[in-house]
């Protein structure tokens, strides 16, 4: 059984222990402002992995909307829904589960 999870907001993939210890390196401030735990905003169900070494220079990072995030492994699709408290803080939020068609 995999202990990896993906953030439902930015898509970064880390172990459950990493999310539990330090939270999401890209989104933790938003989760704290919303008053929700990191585990509520991560999912063990995700598809595809993309390694980002230089997100600011990557067209794939721009396509995944992670070009402003830290280098790391990112999921292409993350199943699940963010808590409404988080979504309310993000006027331009696009779900990473593929439910919103552009």
UniProtKB/Swiss-Prot annotation:
Subcellular location(s) of the protein: Nucleus; Chromosome, Centromere
Cited InterPro entries: RPABC4/Spt4, Spt4, Spt4/RpoE2_Znf, Spt4_sf
A cellular component term, taken from the record's GO annotations: DSIF complex
C4-type zinc finger segments: 7-27
CDD domains per UniProt: Spt4
Listed GO biological process terms: 7-methylguanosine mRNA capping; heterochromatin formation; intracellular mRNA localization; negative regulation of autophagy; negative regulation of transcription elongation by RNA polymerase I; positive regulation of transcription elongation by RNA polymerase I; positive regulation of transcription elongation by RNA polymerase II; regulation of rRNA processing
One Gene Ontology term of the molecular function aspect: RNA polymerase II complex binding
Taxonomy, superkingdom: Eukaryota
Any Pfam family: Spt4
Main location (coarse class): nucleus
Keyword annotations from UniProtKB, A to Z: Centromere, Chromosome, Metal-binding, mRNA processing, Nucleus, Transcription, Zinc, Zinc-finger
Entry's family note: Belongs to the SPT4 family.
Role description: The SPT4-SPT5 complex mediates both activation and inhibition of transcription elongation, and plays a role in pre-mRNA processing. This complex seems to be important for the stability of the RNA polymerase II elongation machinery on the chromatin template but not for the inherent ability of this machinery to translocate down the gene.
Subunit structure: Component of the SPT4-SPT5 complex. Interacts with RNA polymerase II.
Name of the protein this chain belongs to: Transcription elongation factor SPT4
Gene source species: Candida glabrata (strain ATCC 2001 / BCRC 20586 / JCM 3761 / NBRC 0622 / NRRL Y-65 / CBS 138)
